Amino acid sequence: MSGDGEDELCRNALALVNELCFSVRGNHNNEKCIEFSYLLRDRDRTRHIETDISVSLLSVIVTFCGIVLLGVSLFVSWKLCWIPWRDKGLNPQRRDSQHHPHQHLHHHHSHFTDLTVERVDCGPEMPERSYLDLESYPESGIKLSQTSPDIPVDTSSGSKENNIPNAHSQQQVSAPPPATRFNSLPRPIPQQLSSPEFGTQADEKVEQVTSIGQIKPELYKQRSIDTEAKKHQKVNCGRINFMLRYTYTTEQLVVKILKALDLPAKDANGFSDPYVKIYLLPDRKKKFQTKVHRKTLNPIFNETFQFNVPFNELQNRKLHFSVYDFDRFSRHDLIGQVVLDNLLEFSDFSEDTTIWRDILEATSEKADLGEINFSLCYLPTAGRLTITIIKATNLKAMDLTGFSDPYVKASLICDERRLKKRKTSIKKNTLNPVYNEALVFDIPNENMEHVNVIIAVMDYDCIGHNEVIGMCRVGNATDGPGREHWNEMLANPRKPIEQWHQLIEEKVMNSYMTKSFAAGTGATKPVTIVVESPHSV
């Protein structure tokens, strides 16, 4: 049985016994009933006492909390009100005591005839020289600054001939604090003034200086030379180790990138995510790229690449290495580069030749995003534009594996609006995808002059947003290869016109389109090319 039930049963039993004892006549004098009545009174008295104790304990707690809150409020008010008021009351006296000498000094600057100098008893009584009294230093020169020459003071002519007070010159003198600071007051050095060399030096300075503030070219010549030397000096950004071998039978140049050492840190964690791009100059038709190595400054690659180069062209070819730092959500940072020329010298080695080269810092390099090859074909009678995406080469690596998952998206733009979009399939883990896929748009013949097409190469990501690798544009309102390709298509209807296009960055295209539209280029109404952001896919 629960506690509440037992209490209720006890109350009922007590009420019943009370009724039996005092309701029936003759039981008032019964000893048992009288004893029971005393027990009831004691029980009620105990209950009242417990109630009083609980009430008194609660009042004590409330009183204590009130006292604590009162003390905290008094302490806070003392901190906020009393201390600032006390400091405010004491500040005027401190300011008067601290700044009185300076105020006295500035007060007398406008009245130079009333300038007084305090004296110090240091043995025999000697006149104390004021730091504003130039006549006390008849043979010394005025020092305007650390770089300006010393100007001797002419006591005879002085400032009387020019009607200029001495105080104007004195304000420019690099002087120490006033005369009240006895120990810090500079004194003329007798040895320097009395030495025979001092007079000759002063005469030379008088001949060299013709006016105050004259610039000495020799002071800045050395700095300019150092600056030019720093500009021409290239910073070493580590070293790279690779092997070369030329096979005469197949006319192939075999390059094996072994490792790199002491690369600079490009990330906030003190490391880099390096990879190497390699290609032959000057055409750059074929480019290779190593895998990305995470969080290291001494990557080990051990990757081999082959270039088909005839033997008679080795002398005019150069091998170009570019070391990059991989960034997932921004442009890759160029760490440095190495150019190996005169490859004919290394063709004499039939076996692998290990070569070490210093990686030199490169200030900037044009973004190499790759190229795309597609054809345009328009049928005027059907009003149909067919864009055949053939392939892309040398795309930028967007994944840590050193590859990308590219697909191509074509957007049809007219009057600042995207009308339609088409896209190809996704090619996994490649930088040279081959598509051969046709993207068809229905465009009336009269609207061909008002449309543009954006070709964007995207990198597909399973998790997150797809990113733009690079893009190009074709249409009547474009410039360069895009406009030439479009005009050639219109001049040759029902015939596919194939052409290669260089991919550019999204921000570069947007800035160029903004400038061209502001200048009003193009024969037709300017059409804003809206490049679809990867966040909208």
From Swiss-Prot:
CDD domains: C2A_Synaptotagmin-1-5-6-9-10, C2B_Synaptotagmin-3-5-6-9-10
Cofactor binding, per record: Binds 3 Ca(2+) ions per subunit. The ions are bound to the C2 domains.
One Gene Ontology molecular-function label: SNARE binding
Binding positions (Ca(2+) 1): D267, D273, D325, F326, D327
Cofactor: Ca(2+)
Example GO BP: calcium-ion regulated exocytosis
Main location per the UniProt record: membrane
Binding-site residues, Ca(2+) 2: D267, D325, D327, D333
InterPro entries documented for this protein: C2_dom (IPR000008), C2_domain_sf (IPR035892), Synaptotagmin (IPR001565)
Residues on Cytoplasmic side: 79-537
Residues in compartment: Vesicular: 1-52
Domain C2: residue ranges: 236-357, 368-501
Annotated Gene3D superfamilies: C2 domain
Compositional bias (Polar residues): 143-174
Region (Disordered): 92-111, 142-200
Location in the cell: Cytoplasmic vesicle, Secretory vesicle, Synaptic vesicle membrane; Synapse
Subunit structure: Homodimer or homotrimer (possible).
Protein name (record): Synaptotagmin-C
Source organism (scientific name): Diplobatis ommata
Taxonomic classification: Eukaryota, Metazoa, Chordata, Craniata, Vertebrata
